[in-house]
Structure formats: C-alpha cells, structure tokens
C-alpha cells in the first residue's frame, strides 16, 4: 500500500509508538495485525499479504494459491457494512444489478465504484469477469447463504 501518488509511503500523523495496523479497501473486508507494530517517522513495512503476518480474528484474509501464493483481503463488501453477503436482504449482489440497470442485466458500466468487485473499472452483473461471482465464491460457492464477516474490532 502506498500513498495516493502511487509511490510514496503512507504516513500517519501519530506519535511514535506501537499500534495495531488495519487495512481496508473500497469494497473489501479489512484485516488487522494481531500484534502491535512499532511505528515512527521512518518507514515500517507491514506485509498483510504474507501468511507469516498474524491477523486479528478468524480467516481475516483469503488465501490465494497457485504460482504466486499470497494472502488477500476478502472482496465483495459492496454495501460497505463489514460483511460479504450473496443472498437475502442487504446483500452485496443486488446493488451490482441496480448499477447496470435492473431490467438490463447484460449491461456493463465503466465507473469507479464500490460495485466494481474485481477492480477492472467496470460494473458487470453477467458474463465473464462479472462482479457478482467473486461474492459467491467468497461466501462459499456451495453455501450461498453464508455471510463472511469483517474481522476488525
């Protein structure tokens, strides 16, 4: 994670000390370090993508396997309420349909939005690379009624 210029380190206007570091992103559930991290005026690396970095809660990050295994934030919190939910009231799937036009689910909208779950610059409800499927996968494809909760205090 870098500052909004894309290269500079993130800085906080805080006194030097030990802090738990938490990270949230547009439509992802946040993750936080279990242990406090010493922060000061010099840069400190906190690698939440590393399986070796312990996080608060249970299954706070998604394990990505394959050629480049890593840990990632859970995508799909379209409603920004601290949960990823595929079915039922207040789910994260319906706002995607609303964005593309409820009566035209095949539409694609190019926009910066919390409803762009796969972060490709488009909101898409059906077809390949749609924003609905990652929500289903992240709650459990065979258990669409599950709800994935943020693991932040």
Language-model segments: which ranges?
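Cellulosome-associated attachment modules in secreted, modular CAZymes
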Residues: 1-153
């Amino acid at each position: 994670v870098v500052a909004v210029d894309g290269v500079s380190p993130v800085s906080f206007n805080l006194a030097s000390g030990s802090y738990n570091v938490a990270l949230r992103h547009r439509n992802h559930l946040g993750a936080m370090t279990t242990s406090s991290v010493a922060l000061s005026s010099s840069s400190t690396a906190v690698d939440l993508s590393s399986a070796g970095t312990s996080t608060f809660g249970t299954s706070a990050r998604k394990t990505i396997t394959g050629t480049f295994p890593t840990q990632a934030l859970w995508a799909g919190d379209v409603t920004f309420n601290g949960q990823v939910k595929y079915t039922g009231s207040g789910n994260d799937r319906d706002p995607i349909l609303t964005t593309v036009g409820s009566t035209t689910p095949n539409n694609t909208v190019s926009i910066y939005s919390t409803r762009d779950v796969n972060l490709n610059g488009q909101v898409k409800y059906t077809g390949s690379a749609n924003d609905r499927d990652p929500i289903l996968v992240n709650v459990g494809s065979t258990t669409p009624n599950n709800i994935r909760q943020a693991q932040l205090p």
